[in-house]
Amino acid sequence: MADSEARLFDATGKNIGSYKLEVMDTFWKRFMGLMGRPEMPIGDAALFRNCSSIHMFFIKIPLDVIWYGPATPDGHAPILAVSRDVKPWQLSFGPKHTQGCLEVAAGTVPISLDSIEILTASSDRLKATVIPPDYRDVVRDRIQVTRCSDTAAHLGGAAALVHGRAL
């Protein structure tokens, strides 16, 4: 999908990275993934939906993996974890309630990552935001988790909303 992209933002909303996105949306694409590819060019990414773990068998390059949780109807989802520098021939598992992941070249996910926005050629849109570890249990109940500017200062840039009320 040529027109798909992922953009990374810091807590201030500044764009800190953009990726040309390959959506792994068929059985064959998901099965093959990045196997056998000699490199993952900086600026490229692979999106796996409905995926809570990955294998690095026959993959020649290390990757950074951004794991995201369940999306709400308006397309918001929490970033649950970032696995950095996952090496070839390893398995990597997302945290509980992972719904998908974004794979990029190792070392390219900035420490200041606060949110990602994924736009696919089929007009799908997903916005994922980092949530503090103390609030990750909210995801278990599939309650809306999204950025909340009025409490962002004391929660490290993100907060959880439960039925429209900030936690």
Regions found by a protein language model. Give the residues of each.
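Compact, glycine-rich, soluble single-domain proteins
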Residues: 1-167
